[in-house]
């Protein structure tokens, strides 16, 4: 009943109005899985390739008809008749057929959309919710937890048209008893933040990930206005709610220095920028920093890990790009202590699960993440619960492309009840 009988690829639109790949996998017995590939703005240089057409007369060159043709042609032909329950086998067929290190032949956007659609179809054929099927694929059947959200309520960097260098300022409602209550707390802080910004005459337009994108006097001012909003919402900063940042430092790394426009174009060395961040962690309860240096600055990361790694979570995104080869090297060299998991960085569900397992086995945490270009596809919610990853980054409390994931988590928590505990602060590296 789980034999693949039809595969369909199509071009749809993402949350930025750009095309992306959606795939359907149909099985015997009428079971269907459908999934769409997300797309990033600040991307690591070693990510799997997102195949775009480059035809400037169509979607400004961002069309994905070549990737869609790969789904409807060679990929479909290769997996028709195969057993959808063999996820590793299906993914291997596509990866081998593509034949490149970075999936540049078919595009990671094509392979991932089919990979996820296949998992959804297989789950349906087994009569299981997607998170339960993922737990089985992960070798951890029935082991679930609800993730602590990192809610990106102030957007800067590549995600917003403002003067803030650091790309994401996030809140984590660690004091909540459940995921649903964490979402409520996040929503309340989000609305109070709008009031705080308006009272200061600041813009409350939102960026790609649904957070506000005001012009601020400095990067520290973003933390200050969030602290004000947390207090106004009736919560205690550091106890009920902790803070996290994604520096996306590769975006302001120029000629070996970190140049911050929000700090008067000041240029920092790796060590100086590490201490700039350390000072912020002393002023505010920041418990997680992502991509605190450039992806190629491994010596700098070793220093940053030495200075901050036993106090807070240091997450590698552009640094590790969900790639087990790069992560393995990072673990061996003691670089960071956590990995951001974006399945389009590597391009298949099987490889994503391998990265999560490698991280956990090494004592690193794994933070499941959206991309800045998203769709209504909420697979990452099921991935977070099904792997018991413990943390999720899926944007702010606005834009349906972000909220779709929170709503799916609320549904899953309702279905699982006490089977999926919300562990709060304990999930964050260095905070247990």
Curated annotation (Swiss-Prot):
An example Gene Ontology CC term for this record: extracellular region
Cofactor binding note: Binds a second Mg(2+) ion via substrate during catalysis.
Catalytic activity: (2R)-2-phosphoglycerate = phosphoenolpyruvate + H2O
SMART domains found in the cross-reference section: Enolase_C (SM01192), Enolase_N (SM01193)
Binding site for Mg(2+): 246, 290, 317
Cellular localization per UniProt: Cytoplasm; Secreted; Cell surface
Enzyme class name: lyase
Domain of life where this protein originates: Bacteria
Residues annotated to bind (2R)-2-phosphoglycerate: 167, 342, 371-372, 393
Primary subcellular site in the record, as a coarse category: cytoplasm
CDD domains: enolase
EC number: 4.2.1.11
Active site: 209, 342
Similarity comment text for this entry: Belongs to the enolase family.
Protein name: Enolase
Provenance organism: Klebsiella pneumoniae (strain 342)
Gene it is expressed from: eno
């Amino acid at each position: 009943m789980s034999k693949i009988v039809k595969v369909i690829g199509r071009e749809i639109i993402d949350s930025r109005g750009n095309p992306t790949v959606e795939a359907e996998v149909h099985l015997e017995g009428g079971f269907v899985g459908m999934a769409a590939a997300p797309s990033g703005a600040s991307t690591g240089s070693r990510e799997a390739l997102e195949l775009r057409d480059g035809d400037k007369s169509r979607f400004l060159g961002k069309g994905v008809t070549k990737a869609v043709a790969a789904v409807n042609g060679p990929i479909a032909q290769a997996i028709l008749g195969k057993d959808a329950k063999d996820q590793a086998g299906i993914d291997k067929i596509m990866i081998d057929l593509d034949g490149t290190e970075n999936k540049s032949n078919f595009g990671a956007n094509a392979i991932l959309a089919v990979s996820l659609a296949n998992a959804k179809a297989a789950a349906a054929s087994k009569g299981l919710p997607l998170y339960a099927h993922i737990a089985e694929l992960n070798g951890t059947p029935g082991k679930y937890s609800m993730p602590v959200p990192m809610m990106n309520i102030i957007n800067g960097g590549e995600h917003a048209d403002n003067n803030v260098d650091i790309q994401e300022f996030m809140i984590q409602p660690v004091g909540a008893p459940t995921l649903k209550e964490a979402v409520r707390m996040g929503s309340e802080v989000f609305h109070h933040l709008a009031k705080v910004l308006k009272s200061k005459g600041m813009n409350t337009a939102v960026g790609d990930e649904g957070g506000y994108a005001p012009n601020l006097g400095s990067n520290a001012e973003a933390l200050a206005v969030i602290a004000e909003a947390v207090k106004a919402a009736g919560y205690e900063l550091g106890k009920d709610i902790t803070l996290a940042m994604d520096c996306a430092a590769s975006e302001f790394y120029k000629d070996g220095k970190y140049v911050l426009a929000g700090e008067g174009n000041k240029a920092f060395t790796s060590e100086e920028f590490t201490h700039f961040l350390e000072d912020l962690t002393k002023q505010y309860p920041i418990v997680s920093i992502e991509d605190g240096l450039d992806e190629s600055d491994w010596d700098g990361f070793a220093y940053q890990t030495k200075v901050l790694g036993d106090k807070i979570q240091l997450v590698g995104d552009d640094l590790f790009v969900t790639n087990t080869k790069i992560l393995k090297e990072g673990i061996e060299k003691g670089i960071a202590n956590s990995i951001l998991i974006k399945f389009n960085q590597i391009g298949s569900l099987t490889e994503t699960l391998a990265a999560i397992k490698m991280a956990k086995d090494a004592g690193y945490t794994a933070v499941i993440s959206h991309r800045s270009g998203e769709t209504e596809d909420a697979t990452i919610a099921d991935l977070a619960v099904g792997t018991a990853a413990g943390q999720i980054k899926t944007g702010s409390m606005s834009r349906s492309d972000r909220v779709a994931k929170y709503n799916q988590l609320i549904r899953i928590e309702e279905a699982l009840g006490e089977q999926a505990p919300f562990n709060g602060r304990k999930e964050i590296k260095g905070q247990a």
